[in-house]
Amino acid sequence: MLLKQTKIVASISDRRCDVDFIKQLFEAGMNVVRMNTAHASREGFEALIANVRAVSNRIAILMDTKGPEVRTTANAEPIPYKTGDKVKIVGNPDLETTRECIAVSYPNFVSDLNIGGMILIDDGDLELEVIDKTNDYLLCEVKNDATLGSRKSVNVPGVRINLPSLTEKDRNNILYAIEKDIDFIAHSFVRNRQDVLDIREILDAHNSDIKIIAKIENQEGVDNIDEILEVADGVMVARGDLGIEVPQERIPGIQRVLIRKCILAKKPVIVATQMLHTMINNPRPTRAEVTDIANAIYYRTDALMLSGETAYGKYPVEAVRTMTKIAAQAEKDKLEENDIRIPLGENSNDVTAFLAKQAVKATSKLKIRAIITDSYSGRTARNLAAFRGKYPVLAICYKEKTMRHLALSYGVEAIYMPELANGQEYYFAALRRLLKEGRLQPSDMVGYLSSGKAGTKTSFLEINVVEDALKHAEETVLPNNNRYL
Protein backbone atom coordinates (compact mmCIF):
# COMPACT_ATOMS: atom_id res chain seq x y z
CA MET A 1 0.00 0.00 0.00
CA LEU A 2 1.37 3.40 -1.00
CA LEU A 3 2.01 5.83 1.86
CA LYS A 4 1.81 8.66 -0.70
CA GLN A 5 1.43 8.97 -4.46
CA THR A 6 4.71 10.83 -5.06
CA LYS A 7 7.63 8.41 -5.29
CA ILE A 8 10.90 8.77 -3.34
CA VAL A 9 14.39 7.95 -4.61
CA ALA A 10 17.01 7.54 -1.87
CA SER A 11 20.76 7.50 -2.51
CA ILE A 12 22.51 4.76 -0.55
CA SER A 13 26.23 4.30 -0.02
CA ASP A 14 27.91 0.91 0.04
CA ARG A 15 29.31 1.96 3.43
CA ARG A 16 25.80 1.93 4.92
CA CYS A 17 23.62 -0.57 3.09
CA ASP A 18 22.76 -3.41 5.48
CA VAL A 19 19.39 -5.12 5.17
CA ASP A 20 17.92 -3.56 8.30
CA PHE A 21 18.83 -0.04 7.14
CA ILE A 22 17.30 -0.55 3.68
CA LYS A 23 14.18 -2.07 5.24
CA GLN A 24 13.73 0.99 7.47
CA LEU A 25 13.99 3.31 4.45
CA PHE A 26 11.51 1.16 2.50
CA GLU A 27 8.99 1.15 5.33
CA ALA A 28 9.40 4.92 5.68
CA GLY A 29 8.37 5.46 2.04
CA MET A 30 11.39 4.86 -0.22
CA ASN A 31 10.53 3.41 -3.64
CA VAL A 32 13.85 3.49 -5.51
CA VAL A 33 17.47 3.05 -4.39
CA ARG A 34 20.07 5.16 -6.19
CA MET A 35 23.64 3.91 -6.55
CA ASN A 36 26.27 6.50 -7.44
CA THR A 37 29.07 4.96 -9.53
CA ALA A 38 31.39 7.84 -8.64
CA HIS A 39 31.58 6.80 -4.99
CA ALA A 40 31.46 3.00 -4.68
CA SER A 41 33.51 -0.09 -5.44
CA ARG A 42 32.28 -3.10 -7.40
CA GLU A 43 32.27 -5.11 -4.17
CA GLY A 44 30.15 -2.40 -2.58
CA PHE A 45 27.65 -2.60 -5.44
CA GLU A 46 27.40 -6.38 -5.01
CA ALA A 47 26.45 -6.01 -1.35
CA LEU A 48 24.04 -3.14 -1.97
CA ILE A 49 22.17 -4.92 -4.77
CA ALA A 50 21.90 -8.18 -2.81
CA ASN A 51 20.58 -6.39 0.28
CA VAL A 52 18.00 -4.38 -1.67
CA ARG A 53 16.68 -7.54 -3.31
CA ALA A 54 16.59 -9.25 0.11
CA VAL A 55 14.32 -6.54 1.49
CA SER A 56 11.74 -6.45 -1.33
CA ASN A 57 11.43 -7.27 -5.02
CA ARG A 58 9.36 -4.07 -5.33
CA ILE A 59 12.29 -1.72 -4.69
CA ALA A 60 13.76 -0.48 -7.97
CA ILE A 61 17.48 0.19 -8.34
CA LEU A 62 18.78 3.21 -10.24
CA MET A 63 22.46 3.44 -11.19
CA ASP A 64 24.11 6.78 -11.99
CA THR A 65 26.70 7.04 -14.73
CA LYS A 66 29.41 9.66 -14.56
CA GLY A 67 28.80 11.05 -18.05
CA PRO A 68 30.88 13.84 -19.61
CA GLU A 69 31.95 15.39 -16.31
CA VAL A 70 35.18 17.16 -15.37
CA ARG A 71 36.80 16.78 -11.94
CA THR A 72 39.96 17.93 -10.24
CA THR A 73 42.56 15.25 -9.61
CA ALA A 74 43.52 13.98 -6.17
CA ASN A 75 45.47 16.13 -3.76
CA ALA A 76 47.35 14.97 -0.68
CA GLU A 77 45.42 17.18 1.74
CA PRO A 78 42.81 19.99 1.60
CA ILE A 79 44.20 23.15 -0.01
CA PRO A 80 43.10 26.56 1.36
CA TYR A 81 42.73 29.51 -1.04
CA LYS A 82 42.18 33.20 -0.33
CA THR A 83 40.48 35.82 -2.49
CA GLY A 84 42.99 37.23 -4.97
CA ASP A 85 45.29 34.20 -5.00
CA LYS A 86 46.68 33.16 -8.39
CA VAL A 87 46.67 29.51 -9.45
CA LYS A 88 47.37 27.60 -12.65
CA ILE A 89 44.96 25.04 -14.12
CA VAL A 90 46.10 22.26 -16.47
CA GLY A 91 44.28 19.46 -18.23
CA ASN A 92 46.14 16.38 -17.06
CA PRO A 93 44.29 13.50 -15.37
CA ASP A 94 47.59 11.89 -14.31
CA LEU A 95 48.94 14.93 -12.44
CA GLU A 96 48.35 15.47 -8.72
CA THR A 97 46.71 18.76 -7.75
CA THR A 98 48.86 21.12 -5.68
CA ARG A 99 48.31 24.59 -4.26
CA GLU A 100 50.16 26.16 -7.20
CA CYS A 101 48.53 24.05 -9.94
CA ILE A 102 45.08 22.48 -10.09
CA ALA A 103 44.94 19.54 -12.49
CA VAL A 104 41.62 18.45 -14.04
CA SER A 105 40.54 15.19 -15.66
CA TYR A 106 39.81 16.64 -19.14
CA PRO A 107 42.98 16.91 -21.30
CA ASN A 108 41.61 19.65 -23.61
CA PHE A 109 40.38 21.86 -20.78
CA VAL A 110 42.85 24.67 -21.52
CA SER A 111 42.00 24.90 -25.23
CA ASP A 112 38.22 24.97 -24.57
CA LEU A 113 38.35 28.02 -22.26
CA ASN A 114 39.09 31.68 -22.95
CA ILE A 115 40.33 34.64 -20.93
CA GLY A 116 37.46 36.06 -18.86
CA GLY A 117 35.79 32.68 -18.43
CA MET A 118 34.58 31.56 -15.01
CA ILE A 119 35.43 28.19 -13.46
CA LEU A 120 33.36 26.83 -10.57
CA ILE A 121 34.83 24.00 -8.50
CA ASP A 122 33.08 21.80 -5.91
CA ASP A 123 29.52 22.90 -6.75
CA GLY A 124 30.66 26.53 -6.88
CA ASP A 125 32.37 26.64 -3.48
CA LEU A 126 35.59 27.76 -5.20
CA GLU A 127 35.19 30.36 -7.97
CA LEU A 128 38.01 31.20 -10.38
CA GLU A 129 38.35 33.68 -13.24
CA VAL A 130 40.69 33.03 -16.18
CA ILE A 131 43.01 36.06 -16.43
CA ASP A 132 45.65 34.66 -18.80
CA LYS A 133 46.17 31.67 -21.04
CA THR A 134 49.08 29.79 -22.63
CA ASN A 135 49.12 26.60 -24.65
CA ASP A 136 49.84 24.62 -21.50
CA TYR A 137 47.83 26.21 -18.71
CA LEU A 138 45.22 28.75 -17.62
CA LEU A 139 46.22 31.39 -15.10
CA CYS A 140 43.31 32.07 -12.78
CA GLU A 141 42.44 34.47 -9.98
CA VAL A 142 40.60 33.12 -6.94
CA LYS A 143 37.36 35.05 -6.35
CA ASN A 144 36.48 33.80 -2.85
CA ASP A 145 37.95 32.14 0.23
CA ALA A 146 37.57 28.36 0.01
CA THR A 147 39.25 25.02 0.66
CA LEU A 148 39.75 22.52 -2.16
CA GLY A 149 39.46 18.78 -1.48
CA SER A 150 40.23 15.84 -3.78
CA ARG A 151 38.40 14.97 -7.00
CA LYS A 152 35.89 17.83 -6.89
CA SER A 153 33.44 18.72 -9.66
CA VAL A 154 34.42 21.38 -12.21
CA ASN A 155 31.83 23.49 -14.04
CA VAL A 156 32.33 26.16 -16.70
CA PRO A 157 29.03 28.00 -17.25
CA GLY A 158 28.22 28.72 -20.87
CA VAL A 159 31.09 26.65 -22.28
CA ARG A 160 30.50 23.39 -24.15
CA ILE A 161 33.00 20.79 -23.02
CA ASN A 162 33.74 18.52 -25.96
CA LEU A 163 33.84 15.27 -24.03
CA PRO A 164 32.28 12.03 -25.30
CA SER A 165 28.94 11.15 -23.73
CA LEU A 166 30.25 7.89 -22.27
CA THR A 167 33.55 7.20 -20.56
CA GLU A 168 35.11 3.73 -20.55
CA LYS A 169 34.10 3.47 -16.89
CA ASP A 170 30.51 4.30 -17.87
CA ARG A 171 30.51 1.52 -20.48
CA ASN A 172 31.79 -1.00 -17.95
CA ASN A 173 29.19 0.11 -15.41
CA ILE A 174 26.39 -0.20 -17.97
CA LEU A 175 27.49 -3.76 -18.77
CA TYR A 176 27.54 -4.46 -15.05
CA ALA A 177 24.02 -3.01 -14.71
CA ILE A 178 22.83 -5.34 -17.48
CA GLU A 179 24.46 -8.32 -15.76
CA LYS A 180 22.81 -7.47 -12.43
CA ASP A 181 19.40 -6.67 -13.98
CA ILE A 182 19.36 -3.09 -12.68
CA ASP A 183 16.10 -1.24 -13.37
CA PHE A 184 17.20 2.29 -14.33
CA ILE A 185 20.33 4.02 -15.56
CA ALA A 186 20.46 7.76 -14.81
CA HIS A 187 22.91 9.26 -17.30
CA SER A 188 24.66 12.42 -16.13
CA PHE A 189 25.00 15.64 -18.15
CA VAL A 190 22.74 14.60 -21.04
CA ARG A 191 23.09 17.28 -23.72
CA ASN A 192 21.09 15.91 -26.66
CA ARG A 193 19.32 12.84 -28.01
CA GLN A 194 22.59 11.25 -29.15
CA ASP A 195 23.83 11.09 -25.56
CA VAL A 196 20.81 8.89 -24.76
CA LEU A 197 21.12 6.84 -27.94
CA ASP A 198 24.74 6.02 -27.08
CA ILE A 199 23.45 4.15 -24.02
CA ARG A 200 20.48 2.70 -25.87
CA GLU A 201 22.86 1.16 -28.41
CA ILE A 202 24.67 -0.76 -25.66
CA LEU A 203 21.42 -1.88 -24.03
CA ASP A 204 19.91 -3.02 -27.34
CA ALA A 205 23.05 -4.98 -28.21
CA HIS A 206 22.53 -6.99 -25.03
CA ASN A 207 18.73 -7.21 -25.32
CA SER A 208 18.31 -5.24 -22.09
CA ASP A 209 15.10 -3.49 -21.02
CA ILE A 210 16.80 -1.14 -18.53
CA LYS A 211 15.10 2.27 -18.62
CA ILE A 212 17.19 5.39 -19.27
CA ILE A 213 16.70 8.51 -17.13
CA ALA A 214 18.28 11.63 -18.64
CA LYS A 215 19.82 13.92 -16.01
CA ILE A 216 19.41 17.53 -17.13
CA GLU A 217 22.36 19.42 -15.66
CA ASN A 218 23.29 22.17 -18.12
CA GLN A 219 21.81 24.74 -20.52
CA GLU A 220 22.34 22.50 -23.53
CA GLY A 221 20.20 19.78 -21.94
CA VAL A 222 17.47 22.32 -21.15
CA ASP A 223 17.54 23.66 -24.71
CA ASN A 224 17.28 20.16 -26.20
CA ILE A 225 14.72 18.70 -23.80
CA ASP A 226 12.17 17.93 -26.55
CA GLU A 227 14.54 15.75 -28.55
CA ILE A 228 15.87 14.16 -25.35
CA LEU A 229 12.34 13.19 -24.29
CA GLU A 230 11.77 11.50 -27.64
CA VAL A 231 14.38 8.85 -26.79
CA ALA A 232 14.74 8.84 -22.96
CA ASP A 233 12.40 6.94 -20.64
CA GLY A 234 12.33 9.71 -18.04
CA VAL A 235 14.12 12.83 -16.79
CA MET A 236 15.86 13.93 -13.62
CA VAL A 237 15.95 17.65 -12.87
CA ALA A 238 19.44 17.59 -11.32
CA ARG A 239 19.41 21.01 -9.67
CA GLY A 240 22.94 20.80 -8.25
CA ASP A 241 25.04 21.11 -11.39
CA LEU A 242 22.16 22.81 -13.21
CA GLY A 243 22.22 25.60 -10.62
CA ILE A 244 25.90 26.14 -11.38
CA GLU A 245 25.69 25.92 -15.16
CA VAL A 246 22.79 28.40 -15.39
CA PRO A 247 21.92 31.39 -13.14
CA GLN A 248 20.39 29.94 -9.99
CA GLU A 249 17.40 32.30 -10.10
CA ARG A 250 16.28 30.49 -13.26
CA ILE A 251 16.11 27.06 -11.59
CA PRO A 252 12.46 27.24 -10.37
CA GLY A 253 11.22 28.22 -13.82
CA ILE A 254 13.31 25.56 -15.57
CA GLN A 255 12.08 22.96 -13.08
CA ARG A 256 8.47 23.82 -13.82
CA VAL A 257 9.00 23.68 -17.61
CA LEU A 258 10.81 20.34 -17.47
CA ILE A 259 8.12 18.78 -15.27
CA ARG A 260 5.41 19.95 -17.64
CA LYS A 261 7.17 18.59 -20.70
CA CYS A 262 7.67 15.20 -19.01
CA ILE A 263 4.00 14.98 -18.06
CA LEU A 264 2.96 15.87 -21.61
CA ALA A 265 5.31 13.14 -22.89
CA LYS A 266 3.86 10.75 -20.27
CA LYS A 267 7.30 9.96 -18.91
CA PRO A 268 8.34 10.07 -15.23
CA VAL A 269 10.26 13.05 -13.86
CA ILE A 270 12.41 13.25 -10.72
CA VAL A 271 13.25 16.49 -8.89
CA ALA A 272 16.63 16.16 -7.16
CA THR A 273 19.26 17.93 -5.05
CA GLN A 274 19.09 19.53 -1.60
CA MET A 275 15.45 18.65 -0.99
CA LEU A 276 16.17 18.15 2.73
CA HIS A 277 19.81 19.21 2.81
CA THR A 278 19.79 20.43 6.42
CA MET A 279 18.70 16.96 7.56
CA ILE A 280 22.19 15.71 6.77
CA ASN A 281 23.11 17.14 10.18
CA ASN A 282 19.79 18.15 11.77
CA PRO A 283 16.71 16.10 12.71
CA ARG A 284 14.26 18.67 11.30
CA PRO A 285 14.07 20.42 7.92
CA THR A 286 13.88 24.15 7.34
CA ARG A 287 10.53 25.67 6.43
CA ALA A 288 12.00 26.53 3.03
CA GLU A 289 12.80 22.85 2.39
CA VAL A 290 9.28 21.81 3.34
CA THR A 291 7.92 24.39 0.90
CA ASP A 292 10.36 23.28 -1.82
CA ILE A 293 9.09 19.69 -1.61
CA ALA A 294 5.47 20.80 -1.60
CA ASN A 295 5.99 23.09 -4.60
CA ALA A 296 7.59 20.27 -6.60
CA ILE A 297 4.46 18.22 -5.93
CA TYR A 298 2.20 21.14 -6.81
CA TYR A 299 4.15 21.36 -10.09
CA ARG A 300 3.22 17.63 -10.52
CA THR A 301 6.56 15.85 -10.26
CA ASP A 302 6.45 12.04 -10.24
CA ALA A 303 9.30 11.59 -7.79
CA LEU A 304 11.63 13.36 -5.36
CA MET A 305 15.23 12.38 -4.65
CA LEU A 306 17.35 12.41 -1.52
CA SER A 307 21.14 12.43 -1.95
CA GLY A 308 23.49 13.10 0.96
CA GLU A 309 20.52 13.01 3.34
CA THR A 310 20.36 9.21 3.04
CA ALA A 311 23.82 8.39 1.65
CA TYR A 312 25.83 9.72 4.58
CA GLY A 313 23.57 11.98 6.66
CA LYS A 314 22.92 11.56 10.37
CA TYR A 315 19.14 11.18 9.99
CA PRO A 316 18.48 9.07 6.85
CA VAL A 317 15.32 7.28 7.96
CA GLU A 318 13.92 10.48 9.46
CA ALA A 319 14.60 12.25 6.14
CA VAL A 320 12.57 9.69 4.16
CA ARG A 321 9.81 9.73 6.76
CA THR A 322 9.73 13.54 6.70
CA MET A 323 9.55 13.63 2.92
CA THR A 324 6.72 11.07 2.98
CA LYS A 325 4.69 13.18 5.41
CA ILE A 326 5.22 16.38 3.42
CA ALA A 327 4.30 14.63 0.16
CA ALA A 328 1.13 13.08 1.57
CA GLN A 329 -0.06 16.46 2.88
CA ALA A 330 0.83 18.30 -0.33
CA GLU A 331 -1.14 15.75 -2.35
CA LYS A 332 -4.19 16.45 -0.21
CA ASP A 333 -3.74 20.22 -0.53
CA LYS A 334 -3.04 20.53 -4.27
CA LEU A 335 -5.84 22.01 -6.33
CA GLU A 336 -7.31 19.99 -9.19
CA GLU A 337 -7.83 23.12 -11.29
CA ASN A 338 -4.06 23.64 -11.30
CA ASP A 339 -3.37 20.23 -12.82
CA ILE A 340 -1.39 20.29 -16.05
CA ARG A 341 -3.87 19.52 -18.79
CA ILE A 342 -2.71 16.60 -20.92
CA PRO A 343 -3.80 16.64 -24.58
CA LEU A 344 -4.02 13.30 -26.35
CA GLY A 345 -1.16 14.37 -28.61
CA GLU A 346 -0.66 14.29 -32.34
CA ASN A 347 -1.62 10.64 -32.65
CA SER A 348 -5.40 10.82 -32.26
CA ASN A 349 -5.56 7.04 -32.70
CA ASP A 350 -3.74 6.38 -29.42
CA VAL A 351 -6.44 4.25 -27.80
CA THR A 352 -4.42 3.65 -24.63
CA ALA A 353 -4.04 7.39 -23.94
CA PHE A 354 -7.72 8.02 -24.70
CA LEU A 355 -8.95 5.28 -22.37
CA ALA A 356 -6.53 6.31 -19.61
CA LYS A 357 -7.78 9.88 -19.77
CA GLN A 358 -11.41 8.76 -19.63
CA ALA A 359 -10.70 6.52 -16.64
CA VAL A 360 -9.12 9.38 -14.69
CA LYS A 361 -11.92 11.77 -15.67
CA ALA A 362 -14.46 9.21 -14.47
CA THR A 363 -12.99 9.31 -10.96
CA SER A 364 -14.15 12.92 -10.63
CA LYS A 365 -17.63 12.23 -12.05
CA LEU A 366 -18.43 8.84 -10.51
CA LYS A 367 -17.70 7.28 -7.12
CA ILE A 368 -14.69 5.40 -8.44
CA ARG A 369 -12.19 4.62 -5.69
CA ALA A 370 -9.44 2.89 -7.68
CA ILE A 371 -8.25 2.22 -11.21
CA ILE A 372 -6.89 -1.24 -11.97
CA THR A 373 -4.88 -2.28 -15.00
CA ASP A 374 -3.03 -5.47 -15.85
CA SER A 375 0.32 -4.44 -17.22
CA TYR A 376 2.82 -6.15 -19.52
CA SER A 377 5.04 -3.19 -20.47
CA GLY A 378 3.82 -0.55 -17.99
CA ARG A 379 2.68 1.82 -20.74
CA THR A 380 -0.97 2.00 -19.66
CA ALA A 381 0.02 2.63 -16.04
CA ARG A 382 2.37 5.45 -17.11
CA ASN A 383 -0.45 7.00 -19.14
CA LEU A 384 -2.71 6.87 -16.09
CA ALA A 385 0.04 8.44 -13.97
CA ALA A 386 0.40 11.33 -16.43
CA PHE A 387 -3.27 12.26 -16.09
CA ARG A 388 -2.77 12.58 -12.30
CA GLY A 389 -5.97 11.13 -10.86
CA LYS A 390 -6.76 11.62 -7.19
CA TYR A 391 -7.14 7.89 -6.54
CA PRO A 392 -4.33 5.33 -6.85
CA VAL A 393 -3.67 3.15 -9.85
CA LEU A 394 -3.15 -0.53 -9.11
CA ALA A 395 -0.99 -2.06 -11.85
CA ILE A 396 -0.96 -5.86 -11.81
CA CYS A 397 2.24 -6.78 -13.63
CA TYR A 398 3.10 -9.87 -15.63
CA LYS A 399 6.82 -9.35 -14.94
CA GLU A 400 8.81 -8.29 -11.87
CA LYS A 401 10.85 -5.89 -13.99
CA THR A 402 7.71 -4.07 -15.13
CA MET A 403 6.65 -3.71 -11.50
CA ARG A 404 9.94 -2.04 -10.62
CA HIS A 405 9.90 0.15 -13.75
CA LEU A 406 6.68 1.67 -12.39
CA ALA A 407 8.39 2.61 -9.10
CA LEU A 408 8.99 6.12 -10.49
CA SER A 409 5.44 6.75 -11.76
CA TYR A 410 3.17 8.98 -9.69
CA GLY A 411 0.28 7.26 -7.95
CA VAL A 412 0.99 3.80 -9.37
CA GLU A 413 1.10 0.87 -6.97
CA ALA A 414 2.61 -1.98 -8.96
CA ILE A 415 2.21 -5.62 -7.88
CA TYR A 416 3.71 -8.70 -9.52
CA MET A 417 1.33 -11.63 -10.05
CA PRO A 418 2.70 -14.39 -12.29
CA GLU A 419 1.05 -17.42 -13.85
CA LEU A 420 -2.47 -16.11 -14.36
CA ALA A 421 -4.31 -17.08 -17.52
CA ASN A 422 -5.62 -13.67 -18.61
CA GLY A 423 -6.29 -10.08 -17.63
CA GLN A 424 -9.65 -10.88 -16.04
CA GLU A 425 -7.96 -13.18 -13.52
CA TYR A 426 -5.58 -10.36 -12.60
CA TYR A 427 -8.52 -8.00 -12.20
CA PHE A 428 -10.47 -10.25 -9.85
CA ALA A 429 -7.35 -11.09 -7.82
CA ALA A 430 -6.70 -7.35 -7.42
CA LEU A 431 -10.28 -6.71 -6.26
CA ARG A 432 -10.04 -9.42 -3.62
CA ARG A 433 -6.73 -8.02 -2.41
CA LEU A 434 -8.09 -4.47 -2.07
CA LEU A 435 -11.17 -5.74 -0.24
CA LYS A 436 -9.08 -7.75 2.20
CA GLU A 437 -6.87 -4.73 2.93
CA GLY A 438 -9.94 -2.59 3.58
CA ARG A 439 -9.11 -0.19 0.77
CA LEU A 440 -12.31 -0.99 -1.11
CA GLN A 441 -15.86 -1.70 0.01
CA PRO A 442 -18.19 -4.07 -1.89
CA SER A 443 -20.35 -1.10 -2.94
CA ASP A 444 -17.42 0.92 -4.34
CA MET A 445 -16.90 1.44 -8.05
CA VAL A 446 -13.62 0.69 -9.83
CA GLY A 447 -12.25 1.33 -13.29
CA TYR A 448 -10.45 -1.44 -15.17
CA LEU A 449 -8.26 -0.98 -18.25
CA SER A 450 -6.98 -3.97 -20.16
CA SER A 451 -6.35 -5.61 -23.49
CA GLY A 452 -7.47 -8.98 -22.20
CA LYS A 453 -4.26 -10.59 -23.45
CA ALA A 454 -0.66 -10.13 -22.35
CA GLY A 455 1.54 -8.16 -24.70
CA THR A 456 -1.25 -6.45 -26.66
CA LYS A 457 -2.33 -2.82 -26.42
CA THR A 458 -5.02 -1.66 -23.99
CA SER A 459 -8.33 -1.78 -25.82
CA PHE A 460 -11.18 -1.41 -23.31
CA LEU A 461 -12.28 0.34 -20.13
CA GLU A 462 -14.80 -1.19 -17.73
CA ILE A 463 -16.42 0.53 -14.76
CA ASN A 464 -17.90 -1.90 -12.25
CA VAL A 465 -19.24 -2.12 -8.72
CA VAL A 466 -16.85 -4.38 -6.80
CA GLU A 467 -19.45 -6.87 -5.57
CA ASP A 468 -21.00 -7.16 -9.04
CA ALA A 469 -17.62 -7.82 -10.64
CA LEU A 470 -16.77 -10.53 -8.10
CA LYS A 471 -20.19 -12.10 -8.52
CA HIS A 472 -19.45 -12.33 -12.24
CA ALA A 473 -16.11 -13.96 -11.38
CA GLU A 474 -17.90 -16.68 -9.41
CA GLU A 475 -20.41 -17.24 -12.19
CA THR A 476 -17.64 -17.73 -14.73
CA VAL A 477 -15.89 -20.15 -12.32
CA LEU A 478 -12.61 -18.25 -12.38
CA PRO A 479 -10.19 -19.42 -9.67
CA ASN A 480 -10.09 -17.63 -6.34
CA ASN A 481 -6.44 -16.57 -6.37
CA ASN A 482 -5.92 -16.53 -2.63
CA ARG A 483 -2.16 -16.92 -3.05
CA TYR A 484 -2.02 -13.25 -4.08
CA LEU A 485 -4.06 -11.87 -1.17
Task: Label the model's feature ranges.
Residues 1-485:
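Non-catalytic helical/linker scaffolds that mediate oligomerization, partner binding
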